[in-house]
Amino acid sequence: MRALAIACLLCCASAGLAQSAAPLRLADTWPLPEHELPYAGAQPSTHRLQLDLIAFRDTQWEPDHILRAVRDAAALLAQCGIRLQRAELYRFDGGEPSLRYLSTPVSRQLVRRVRPAKPAVFFVRDTRHVPTFDAEAFGTGNTATRPELVFTVWITAASRDLPLALAHELAHVLMDSGEHSIEPGNLMREETVPGNTRLTPEQCARATAAGEHNGLLQRELPR
């Protein structure tokens, strides 16, 4: 259903943008349905998360690599009672070569053209931003002049320890905060390296409260 919606939007957008932009084409989709996303939390989940994942087929990003990282990142967020209910990777062909890079004006255009549900994760070749980050998250605090990017994560091919980087950036988005931790072993330390996996109860509370407030998380229904 979601893929059809995006495809329809792209067809409409292509007609309107034909004079100014090379058309985008949805090449394929790679769903991760609920039964392929076992919940790894020690306690019952309190909130549900859904993710739209965007990549271009002619980049380094392979679907298996992305989907494996998404599963592993979901296991890290489960310590906060957050259950990944659904994720789907949408791969595109066409468009301008610049769309494969994180660059504010071009990335704003990409989000407008693709219109993903949020939070959304974009897997790109590299960044044009200075200073340079291998991955970057956007919340309400850093998107006043670029509102299209709010609640998106951008992961470049230079990112190491991809599940950790993805979970770290998603936590920034869910908490709607750019703050880092100095606590040893914390997922929100500036460096995403093996061993930095824990989130404190306070961080979890902020992620679930802000995530629910911003419409990024849905509270679990009573069972």
Protein language model regions, located:
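Catalytic Zn2+-binding segment of zinc metalloproteases
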Residues: L170-G185
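Short pre-active-site segment immediately N-terminal to the catalytic Zn-binding motif
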Residues: E148-A167
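Positively charged n-region of N-terminal signal peptides that target proteins for export
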Residues: M1-L4
